[in-house]
């Protein structure tokens, strides 16, 4: 019967937190090419106010930016060939979709905080 190697055996890997920061930087650079910087700043501020400077906040920001960029590219970004049908312009406004997603996240956060405050009173 074979034994499993210990977790610290094997090739060295990059520390998780460094990898998360690198991925976030790459996504941020790409998002700045496609979305309004003021909108991205508002999203970053919301995540920071909610999670502080934590890996959990960085992970949430990564998930939101990945989804926003995927939808943007899928809809036919002028800088990308992903999802683009030649001769057809996308009629969707992806900045408006991203704004709605951010607004939904903020409303959901406020509702969670409000329910916690009301439950705490009792």
Curated annotation (Swiss-Prot):
A Gene Ontology term for the protein's cellular component: host cell nucleus
Localization in the cell: Virion; Host nucleus
Other notes: This is a macaque isolate.
Gene coding for it: vpr
Predominant localisation class: virion
Gene Ontology annotations of biological process type: symbiont entry into host cell; viral penetration into host nucleus
Transmembrane segments: none
Record-listed Phosphoserine modification sites: 80
Matching Gene3D superfamilies: 6.10.210.10, VpR/VpX protein, C-terminal domain (1.20.5.90)
Family annotation (InterPro entries): RetroV_VpR/X (IPR000012)
Subunit structure comment from the entry: Interacts with human UNG.
Key words of the record: Activator, AIDS, Cell cycle, Host nucleus, Host-virus interaction, Phosphoprotein, Transcription, Transcription regulation, Viral penetration into host nucleus, Virion, Virus entry into host cell
Protein name in UniProt: Protein Vpr
Physiological role: Stimulates gene expression driven by the HIV-2 LTR. Prevents infected cells from undergoing mitosis and proliferating, by inducing arrest or delay in the G2 phase of the cell cycle. Cell cycle arrest creates a favorable environment for maximizing viral expression and production.
């Amino acid at each position: 019967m074979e034994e499993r190697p210990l977790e610290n055996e094997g090739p060295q890997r990059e520390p998780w937190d460094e990898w998360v920061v690198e991925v976030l930087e790459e996504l941020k650079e790409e998002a700045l090419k496609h979305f309004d910087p003021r909108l991205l700043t508002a999203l970053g501020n919301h995540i920071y106010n909610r999670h502080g400077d934590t890996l959990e906040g960085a992970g949430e920001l990564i998930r939101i930016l990945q989804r926003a960029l995927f939808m943007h590219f899928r809809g036919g970004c002028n800088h990308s060939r992903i999802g683009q049908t030649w001769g057809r312009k996308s009629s969707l406004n992806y900045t408006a979709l991203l704004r709605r997603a951010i607004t939904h996240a903020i409303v959901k956060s406020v509702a969670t905080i409000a329910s916690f405050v009301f439950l705490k009173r009792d």
